Amino acid sequence: MDIQLFQGYGGKVIVAVDYGERKCGVAFGEILPQKSLVIPTKNLKEFIRKLKPDKIIFGLPLSMSGKYTQQTFKTVAVAFKFSKEYETYLCDERLTTKIGERISKRDDAVSAALIFQSFFENSSVCEKVTDPRKKVDLALEKVDGEVLLYEFPDPSLNIEAREVDVVTKNPVLAYFYSKNGYFVGRELWEKKYDLIISGKNCEELKKYLKENGRLVCL
């Protein structure tokens, strides 16, 4: 692929990526995608290095019901690595109708172009990739019951309990929890807990406590 055409953009090229384990759809340009194609995933890093983009936009794959999937975390892992060198974003694919329609067609190059387009047309569905983790000094005794970690920023927290649920809408934080073996949801379940540890929305969480349950707010 000859990318000399884009050398004069002064670092303002934007790249959109529809990530897959074997191949990726990529689209690049300034305000509009001027080229879209499919490349082997193994070549993605070198492709982006040569293009020297100002921003990278990854489509965030969620299930149609809005749940995290294994493909979500594979994509987030790659996006997080790129975020250490480039300004990187994740855009929820479901919230763009045209992107949703491509699921049946599965044209990776077109998908990347639509992800590119969604960044400009509906930036509210896109989130800049940063490291959301924060070390929290919290000593907990073993809990003989069910625990909820809600938007809690420390995936390394050592907690012993019969069951631990994690809920966060931050896909990067969810990825780090999944690496530690947790099942992570984006929405609260209709259940009650013996202990809730929360990073936000504490008042709203009281209804999810069991009788004599405890709520810990940061």
From Swiss-Prot:
InterPro entries: RNaseH-like_sf, YqgF, YqgF/RNaseH-like_dom, YqgF/RNaseH-like_dom_sf. Could be a nuclease involved in processing of the 5'-end of pre-16S rRNA. SUPFAM superfamilies: Ribonuclease H-like. One of its GO terms (molecular function) is nuclease activity. It is an enzyme of class 3 (hydrolase). One of its GO terms (cellular component) is cytoplasm. Pfam families: RuvX. One of its GO terms (biological process) is rRNA 5'-end processing. The keyword Kinase does not apply. Its EC number is 3.1.-.-. Belongs to the YqgF nuclease family. The keyword rRNA processing does not apply. It is found in: Cytoplasm. CDD domains: YqgF. Keywords: Cytoplasm, Hydrolase, Nuclease, Ribosome biogenesis. This is Putative pre-16S rRNA nuclease.
